[in-house]
């Protein structure tokens, strides 16, 4: 079975770069890290279809045929056929020392030398097979000049070729520069030298083909050779080395190269050029018959005349610095002026040059980092970090940044930054998987009627819970006898109107906080809102808040005036009060239905249900497609000890079946079991049907969307991306902005209260966290929620609390197993609560207790100095009369003289009444005091005060 394709392999087949394919995969919602990551076959098929739609054809067949096309260009067995032994090669080399003289006088000889090299299939084997054709006594003919350089006697070949001839049009092979290499020596290039017979030039005269057609250093015909025997002079050791290497004799020249002369790495001047003219005349005095370690055509003794191009001076090859990169020089005035103008550009912040957006709009997700911003604008993340630092913000490249900071940085670069809302972010995520939430599929004929979904809201103690209990007891089946599953947050009741059986789905939400969270996520989970108002209490603040929530969600309202049986109840007063908030009763000419009920006495409950159905029929189009994949909302979720994560969901459209792959918020899984409000197993649930679902890998949040997807892989990818985005948004929200101005205050010691929240369901944990974060305290203390979860307190929670010095808040849950023992051993404080308001009060008191105390000054007494006595042991003694209050020993005093403060915060070191020491002296008595401030006079007033701690509020 073939293995999975990797990203770079698929990119090669599609004919795109790996970077482009990685970007496309990320846009399509596929999580791949690098180009070596494997891809699932469905994703491969998806990518091929995507690129075929863009007009890109795959290149898989061409890639498979590419190795076969290279084989004819490498005829390896062709080299050994004309090869000769070194003994045979040395014999015909001797009688041709003066062959190049007539050829050297012909200057047009280099021109035809450029023709034979680019021919396809031209190799050293063909050159050797044609060796007998050009005769040695006829070197003056210009016609075979190109062949004479390559068709010399067989002795001109150093040894049989080990490498194939270069491909036509391809780059010439790299020439080795290690003279001590023991490996096979490279064969000389065809057409590498233009001297007939590869014989050395006597006296270093001008050589044919030595001048490059591309300029550079001229040959000896243009200037005299350099002193020292390097300018094309033959080596004296050339004759002795010809027998060993199979090349021609060297006549004179420079000294033998040593390892000290070798460069540590190949230079650009040693690299073979692409043009044929640059290949001609590569050899110096040694020519092709030079030392095999230097390669064919490498300059022997010198070769500076044609060995390299570029600047004058220096030697080529392995003996000096070739004409490579230019030396670093001074900047021109134009370069300096351009750099100065670039530094003065408007998009340069603190010396950091940033791109100019030109007013373009950049969309970023919540909690985006500077790396994400830099990727959007093709900039360097380090430059953004430095620019933000110059603006006074200390942020790393990968840290989540809040919306204000991103917009500030965008304004500096002339970009308009838009942070995507949670709704748009989730919609774009689903669109990347070709999914949509909130719309019915199919035509009008596919839509069917569904029951209305009703949420009951109202002020505390107005009878909302009693109304729900009354409705449930009224519609419980006779076989159940009131045995309703109280933990479920939604249920259906049946109402008979005009001999028709109608169903209504009620949501038992834990208050308006959860209702707000659901509306904020854009889930149309509620069709009608029932507003419960007590007739004897009137409109309260939470009643007004519930009205505002319902209006913001564009939900019709039915008002239930409760407790009409109590004395002092005034339903008409309630109608008048609600008129101020836009709820005008129908009897007053409005469109809001008011129903007077008594939930305790079960009065007119059926009338309320009938009003709900009439409002639904008149104001709403309650239809859905039951045949599509199910979509809904998670009303509540909790962690059960035996069943695992259990979510109470309500299906809005489609049909949810056992075995479907679902994703709810950042949780995903496969539906293993569904039960209704009576605890009965359900195989499928249609629109507006509430069920309890098992099979998720985690506990979703209250109000999270439920979606049926194609398979578990898609569900996992959607959940992981949602989880990552939630973490980034939370990190950006909780990160405290540190600027250079408040750096000193940040570095000061601050008190932080770390909390770990555990609750019985996701809704209570969410409500508790939101309420705790809204507690307003001084900046000296901070509240940090380091972890939150659903279920009992575990040992993991205790270990985390012990490591981070945190307090565990357990809401309607207890510690399980050995968690209590470990908490006692580690000294971890676990607080248990059943009422959310009690938890909020105690946490607020704990935060206030962590505040630094505030002291205020309170005056205790007042005394006047009447006389001054001198004592050698203690100094001056003030004889005083206490005018008001009390004077205490060791108390703080303030000395006044003529209404001016002379000494502040002095101390009473000694206090005596008559001759006895006294702790305090009351008003109307005389006393003697020794003060810490010695400069006292008669008539001075002494104010005695103390610092009293004031409780923080």
Swiss-Prot record:
Organism: Corynebacterium diphtheriae (strain ATCC 700971 / NCTC 13129 / Biotype gravis)
Keyword GTP-binding among UniProt keywords: yes
Family, as annotated: Belongs to the TRAFAC class translation factor GTPase superfamily. Classic translation factor GTPase family. IF-2 subfamily.
UniProt region (G4), positions on chain: 562-565
Domain of life: Bacteria
Segments of skewed composition (Low complexity): 81-93, 123-133, 143-160, 233-248
GO cellular component, one term: cytosol
Sequence ranges assigned to domain tr-type G in this UniProt record: 449-621
MF terms in GO: GTP binding; GTPase activity; translation initiation factor activity
Membrane spanning stretches: none
UniProt-annotated stretches for the region G2: 483-487
Ranges of compositional bias, category Basic residues: 327-336
Binding annotation for GTP: 458-465, 508-512, 562-565
UniProt-listed PANTHER family: TR-TYPE G DOMAIN-CONTAINING PROTEIN, TRANSLATION INITIATION FACTOR IF-2-RELATED
Keyword Nucleotide-binding: yes
Annotated Gly residues bias: 202-219, 280-323
Name of the protein in its database record: Translation initiation factor IF-2
Region (G1) residue spans: 458-465
Entry's localization field: Cytoplasm
Region ranges (Disordered): 55-340
Keyword tags: Cytoplasm, GTP-binding, Initiation factor, Nucleotide-binding, Protein biosynthesis
Region feature G3, mapped onto this chain: 508-511
Signal peptide: none
InterPro entries assigned: EF-G-like_DII, EFTu-like_2, IF2_II, IF2_N, P-loop_NTPase, Small_GTP-bd, T_Tr_GTP-bd_dom, TF_IF2_bacterial-like
